[in-house]
Regions:
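Alpha-helical transmembrane segments and their membrane-interface exit regions
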Residues: 1-2, 59-66, 121-130
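Conformational gate/switch positions in structured elements
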Residues: 2, 26, 30, 90-92, ...
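Cytosolic, membrane-interface loops and tails of multi-pass inner-membrane proteins
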Residues: 3-18, 68-85
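Perimembrane helix-loop junctions in membrane proteins
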Residues: 5, 43-46, 69-76, 106-107, ...
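Generic hydrophobic alpha-helical membrane-span motif
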Residues: 7-10, 31, 35, 95-102
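Multi-pass membrane catalytic core of lipid/isoprenoid biosynthesis enzymes
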Residues: 10-65
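Multi-pass alpha-helical membrane architecture of UbiA-family
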Residues: 39-40, 44-45, 59, 70, ...
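C-terminal membrane-associated helical module and adjoining short loops/tails
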Residues: 79-160
Length: 160
């Protein structure tokens, strides 16, 4: 997900193609970083009513954040061709780094309470909606994020 915008910006696109790209990217993000984590947490947390409510609210927070971002991004693109330098609120993609860490801790029985998953969703979902500007990572930070993701994958393979 880190590279799709960079790839898209190398292509000459009409206004409608740009708008379509924003929408389809957000739909993909909603499924990958909203619905999938929500269903995962619901399943691993014992399919309780509380985890169903929390997971549903998490998906709703991701949806609201992405829809609001789309409105802001369309407006921004109509005013400038510059690349965005900040995010408004925590990006939905951050769950892809946080959820595996929590799962690894849970799997290694370092912390056995399965409610840690719904708590993560509450914190993360709240972060999606906070009107806080977060600076976009540069190349070095992106490399660190990729390295951390690779480390997570190998850790999950080795320890599970």
């Amino acid at each position: 997900d880190m590279f799709d915008g960079a790839v898209a910006s190398t292509k000459t696109r009409s206004k409608n193609e740009k708008r379509f790209g924003i929408q389809i990217d957000s739909l993909s993000d909603l499924i990958s970083f909203g619905v999938l984590p929500g269903v995962f947490v619901y399943m691993i947390s014992g399919k309780s009513t509380a985890s169903a409510i929390i997971s549903s609210l998490f998906v709703l927070c991701a949806l609201i954040r992405l829809a609001y971002f789309n409105v802001l991004e369309e407006e921004r693109q109509s005013q400038t061709t510059e690349h965005r330098k900040t995010y408004l609120g925590v990006p939905v993609t951050t769950i892809a780094l946080l959820l595996p860490v929590v799962y690894l801790i849970y799997s290694l029985e370092l912390y056995t309470v399965s409610m840690m998953f719904p708590v993560l969703l509450v914190i993360q979902g709240t972060g999606f909606l906070l009107p806080v500007e977060i600076k976009k990572p540069g190349k070095a930070k992106k490399a660190c994020i990729v390295a951390f993701g690779i480390f997570e994958v190998f850790s999950l393979i080795v320890f599970l």
